C-alpha cells in the first residue's frame, strides 16, 4: 500500500486562524477585551454595533481623535492600554471605510 498525500485546495483562501490565533493571539485578545469594555460601557443594544451608530462622518472623526489621544498617551491609561486603544480605534476607522466602500460598490 502506498502512502497518498491528501489534497486541499485552500492556497488562495485567507488564513484567518493562522493570522488571528497564531501570529497575533495576544494582541487580538487585548483588542477583543477593549471592545468588550466599550460594549459594556456604551451598550445601547445587545448587537455590539453601538460603536457604529455614530455614523460614518462623526464616527471616523471621533475614532481618529481617540486614536491620536491614545497615540500621544493623553490620559490616565497605562502605556499598554493606550496601545490597545490605538489598535481598536484603527480597526473601527478601517471598518467604517470598508463598509462604506462595500456599499458604494454595489
Language-model segments: what does each one mean?
Residues 1-106:
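Intrinsically disordered, low-complexity regulatory regions
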Amino acid at each position: 500500500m502506498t502512502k497518498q498525500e491528501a489534497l486541499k485546495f485552500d492556497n488562495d483562501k485567507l488564513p484567518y486562524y493562522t493570522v488571528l490565533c497564531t501570529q497575533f493571539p495576544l494582541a487580538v485578545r487585548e483588542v477583543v477585551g477593549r471592545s468588550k469594555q466599550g460594549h459594556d460601557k456604551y451598550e445601547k443594544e445587545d448587537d455590539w454595533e453601538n460603536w457604529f451608530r455614530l455614523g460614518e462622518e462623526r464616527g471616523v472623526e471621533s475614532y481618529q481623535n481617540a486614536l491620536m489621544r491614545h497615540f500621544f498617551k493623553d490620559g490616565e491609561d497605562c502605556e499598554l492600554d493606550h496601545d490597545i486603544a490605538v489598535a481598536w480605534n484603527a480597526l473601527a476607522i478601517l471598518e467604517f471605510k470598508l463598509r462604506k466602500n462595500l456599499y458604494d460598490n454595489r
